[in-house]
A protein has these predicted regions:
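Small beta-barrel nucleic-acid-binding modules, primarily SNase/OB-fold domains
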Residues: 2-3, 23-192
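Generic early N-terminus positional signal peaking at residue ~5-7
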Residues: 5-7
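Bacterial N-terminal signal peptides
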Residues: 9-21
Length: 192
């Protein structure tokens, strides 16, 4: 039996299908939990950051829909009380919901000339500073992300010493955004 050579477009299509299948299989593999050594290294990394700052204000930029970078910061800021879509999936490819959330946060920052004031609450497991942040006019970034339908409430039972009702305020904003199907809620609710 003679094997005929494939036409270049057919060979390319087969190669792409096989590559995608192997990439999807690799991405579906569960991640191994961190080893005790890795946890210890991460703990040492967080300790190297020093004490939690009392406050921070300065120029900030959006890294993703829930994380800020800023001038003079030793660690990134994770906005308290929200969870936005991940910017990149397990294959490190940016996805549309994550890009929309980051763009929305970037627009909020741009309207305030990137001037941000933050009140840190704690470090998270990734050594980011979890903080409630507001822009120049006093607008709460986390609340604005939730009200715009670009994030939902996350760990809202954690009480902030300076605003005990922040969690309830965020939950109310999420309810209204969901009811009005703002931002990403149509996709999250399966309408699209």
């Amino acid at each position: 039996m003679k094997i005929l050579p494939l036409a270049p477009p057919v060979a390319l299509a087969i190669a792409l299908v096989l590559t995608a299948a192997f990439a999807a299989d690799a991405a579906a593999q569960p991640r191994k939990p961190p080893t005790p050594e890795a946890k210890e290294a991460k703990s040492a990394e967080c300790a190297a950051l020093g004490e939690l700052p009392k406050a921070w204000d300065g120029q900030a930029f959006a890294i993703d829909g829930q994380t800020l970078g800023g001038t003079g910061l030793k660690a990134h800021l994770r906005i308290w009380g929200i969870q936005a879509p991940e910017l990149r999936d397990t294959t490190r490819v940016e996805n549309v919901p994550g890009m929309r959330a980051r763009a929305f946060l970037a627009d909020l920052l741009a309207k305030a000339d990137h001037k941000v004031k933050c009140r840190p609450a704690r470090f998270d497991r990734e050594c980011r500073i979890v903080a409630q942040c507001s822009v120049g006019d006093g607008g709460d970034l986390g609340g604005s992300m939730i009200a715009g339908g670009m994030a939902y409430g996350f760990e809202l039972a954690e009480a902030l010493p300076w605003e005990s009702r922040a969690g309830q305020r965020y939950a109310d904003a999420e309810f209204e955004a969901r009811k009005a199907r703002r931002g990403l809620w149509p996709a999250w609710l399966g309408d699209q």
